[in-house]
Amino acid sequence: MVTFSSGKAVTFKDVLSNLHILDYDYYFNVVDGLLAENATQPLLLLDEILRKGFDGQNFIVGLSEHLRNLLVSQDSRTVQLMEVPDSIRKKYAEQAQACSPSLLLSWLNISNQCDINYKASRNQRLTVELALMKMANVNAVFKSNGKGEANATAEPAGLKKKLNP
């Protein structure tokens, strides 16, 4: 890393840039947008990430890992399963309080399907964008279906009924 630092102090941002790694903050901001049931913020963040040269599949894999860490951080007995610094662990604990386990499982299911289908897709960007839009709307679908909250499936029966009368 010293070679790339131009003689100045090496910062966390420099390391991320040189190693081409996405910062945790991107994923925290994506989840904030999803919690607000707003697809715009996650889509704009995805665009920014793609413009920086990151691969869409790397983004979705990172988002899946972030969602998994949120789920794991909801139980004090499983927090040790996260391999992150203590400062980041605290941020996970804070964000996890705003997410139900069923919502996180629904999002994980959607992101996992996106990851599986990514390579076969002819429009990979759309595949990731569609996953983000589904995640942003999963709670709204369940609320309109009268269930109140998302369960662990990505495509609820109510949605299928609306699409196939």
Summary of predicted features, one role per range:
Residues 1-158:
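Extended, largely alpha-helical regulatory/partner-binding modules appended to the mid-to-C-terminal parts
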Residues 157-165:
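Long, low-complexity intrinsically disordered regions
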